[in-house]
Amino acid sequence: MFRLSLGVTLVAAAFFANTAFASHDTIKPVAYDSLGKCVKAALSKKDGKIVKLEMKSERKSPTYEFDIEMADGTAWDVECSVKTGKVTEIEEEVAADNEKFKALAKVSEADAKSTALAAHAGEVVEVEYELEPDGKASYEFDILEADHEEVKIEVDATTGKIVETSYEVYQVGQE
C-alpha cells in the first residue's frame, strides 16, 4: 500500500511540477492583488516597458508609480491607487531642454529647488522635468532627508508653488 501511495504522489507531483513550469513562461499579473491590478491598469494607458516601480505615500494614500518607456523613446510616469487599482495620474517625463517644458517654465530650476529644500531640508538626489495632464510643467525633486527618508516634492514650473508632496516607501528598478 505504501508503494502505491508513494507512486501516486510522485506521479501527481511530476504532473503538477510540469504544469507549473509550463505556465511559467506565460505568467501574467493576477487581478486579485493590488500590484497586479495596477500593472494592468498602467500598461492599458501606456503600453511600453516598465523600467521602475515606486511605492509612495501620497496624501497618506498608498500609490504605485510606474516609469514606463515607450518604443518611440517617450517616458511616462503612471500613478495608480493601491486601494482601487485605478490610474490616478499620467505625466510625461521630458528632458530639461524640452521646448514645451522651457516655454511653460517661468520659474528657474534653482528657484524651484530652493522652494523644495525650504519645505524639506536634505540632499536632492534626482530631478525630473514633467509635463502634466492639464498642460502645466513641473519640477519633481527627490530629496533624501537626514533621517534617510526620501521625499518627492513637485513644484509648479510656472508659479513656483509646491503642488504635491509624497514619501517613497520603496523603489525597484533604475533611477
Which residues are covered by each model-predicted region?
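Long, terminal "pre-/pro-" and other extracytoplasmic accessory regions
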Residues: F2-V11, F16-E175
